[in-house]
Amino acid sequence: MITRNPKIDGSATTVQSLLREMKKSDPQEYRVEGRIQVPDWRGVNNHFQGIAPINGEASITGDISASADRAWVANFLQGTSSPSEVQGVWSTQNYDHAGGIQRLGELLVVPLESDNGATVAFLQGSSYLYEIHQPDGHKASAAAITNYTDSAGVEQALLMVYRYDPKSFDIFRAPADSVSSNTWVRVGGSSEISGREQYQCFALVTQTSTAGVEDTVYLVGLREDEKVVLFSLVTLGSFFGSLAELEQYQFDGSQWRYGVGLQIVSSTSIRIFGCSEDPSGDRDDYHFPLYVWG
């Protein structure tokens, strides 16, 4: 299993520059069609939440999660011609909310909620691999994941699981080559995020260093008001887990309440994916739009 994401080449550009220079209106629109049956999505409280495009790809391919009475995730694939098609669906009746999602190579992390309990499931495609559990009362509303080179030159995988109250993260780490099975260790928590705005999804993006060994890791927050918030993250020393807001960027052209996510296309390119509505049609014959900035 591939467990690596592309890293932004710090000698050529920066995460901050890529977000700052990205066109933030008039996104390209794509269509996704599905004929694999999904759980019922109808109802005022049911909606898409997170989008996890496959990183290192230019095609409209990846996963979308549903916050519904029965949590589910659909895998979509763009073939030689548009539109993209749903190729697989994973669901569980034990959880009622699939939150914000991100991929690490072929590994997809899916936060799931039920009452005050929370679990993070790990999938490969639509196949379940394993899960980890959050402390009691800590709802897992989004999860972000990346790989980075630490100060000792070791490639690590980093997982951040978001909870609403307080607005902060549990942080887990594992050797990057071992996360096809559960080797995660909780290594701490983050500082709190200020403000009342609702985040739909988060993404971790790694930038290579131009001086020294250790990579720089950024957290990108994607809010339902179509605003992107960039945070720096401390991954070393006594301030490990500290977040500092760097910039905010206003986007428009979709409704991120119905799903949003980030894609690392290459070492010099990132894109934002958004949705604007629930699926149209029947449970076994449906379609929905995707909007792409970048």
Annotate the PLM regions.
Residues 2-42, 52-92, 122, 126:
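Beta-propeller domains
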Residues 28-42, 81-92, 127-135, 182-193, ...:
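A short beta-strand motif characteristic of beta-propeller blades
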Residues 42-52, 91-102, 135-151, 194-209, ...:
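Repeated scaffold domains used in trafficking and secretory/extracellular systems
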Residues 47, 74-113:
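Blade-loop segments of beta-propeller domains
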Residues 55, 60-64, 105, 111-114, ...:
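Recurrent small/Gly-Pro-centered beta-turn motifs in extracellular repeat architectures
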Residues 55-57, 105-107, 154-157, 213-217, ...:
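Short coil/turn segments that connect the beta-strands within blades of beta-propeller domains
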Residues 66-75, 116-122, 156-157, 165-175, ...:
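Structural motif
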Residues 190-257:
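Intrinsically disordered, low-complexity segments enriched in Gly and acidic/Ser/Thr residues
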